[in-house]
Amino acid sequence: MHWTLAGNLAEVLAALEAAAASGAEGCVCTELALTGFHRRLPELLDPAALAAAEAQLRAACARLGIAAAVGMPTLGEGGAVFNSHAYIDASGREVGRVHKRGLTASEASFFTPGGARGWTVLGGLLATSVLCREMLDVAALLPELAAVPAGSEGLPRVVFWPSYIGASDAEQAALCRAYVDGAEMLARELGAWVLQSNWPEGLNLPGPQGFGASVVIAPDGRRVAVLPRDAAALQRVDIG
């Protein structure tokens, strides 16, 4: 994570390059990957700079022939700022966004909560996103994810889980376990893969804080992979 838009954009572009080089057809990035999730975020909300960064992401996806789901702020009307996960297809076209609704108290002092979410067809998958602590809200999410777009019933379902969570102490470790329990339940109930992309570090509190350790959960609720803790990593997942 970096304090600047340029630094974080470079990291996302490098991740897309690495994913494409591995033969992947898509890449899932973290919560607010484009800006970083830190106390200087309000300084990075210049509309022109954000638009230029998003244009670079779309161009990279088109050049590499890879789809991406990338966390970024969305600037709305009346000064609203949403914490969003944006979907870009392999032609470089944005095909959807999910705005985080289940905000923490501190997030709610800055971000505007999103509304109901649905599914988006992305790279031959039926995708949606559950952002960070929203994995505690599975009971509320299931009804709005019950319906799928017409004609997409046979596509594999994938829930992207961009996050910024760390098991920094016993209380936070217990909370992280509750998040994963929610993710496993969501996978089973929807028959969907859950792909977490958690930040491997934070800037507000330097040093190891128990970040990373992203999980891959199969549609039957089994945890099939756990990435390294407090370290950046790329995991290829084959979804059929």
Model-derived segments and spans:
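CN hydrolase (nitrilase-like) catalytic-core segments centered on the catalytic cysteine
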Residues: 50-69, 136-229
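A short acidic/small-residue loop/turn micro-motif
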Residues: 102-104, 229-233
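Short beta-strand scaffold segments in enzyme catalytic cores
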Residues: 70-72, 84-87, 118-119, 212-216, ...
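Generic N-terminal amphipathic, Lys/Arg-enriched alpha-helix
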Residues: 1-2
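Active-site catalytic loop in hydrolytic enzyme cores
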Residues: 76-157, 162, 171-181, 239-240
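Cys-nucleophile CN-hydrolase/nitrilase-fold catalytic domain and related Cys-dependent amidase chemistry
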Residues: 5, 9-90, 165-192
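Residues that act as N-cap/strand-start positions at coil-to-secondary-structure junctions
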Residues: 112-114, 208, 231
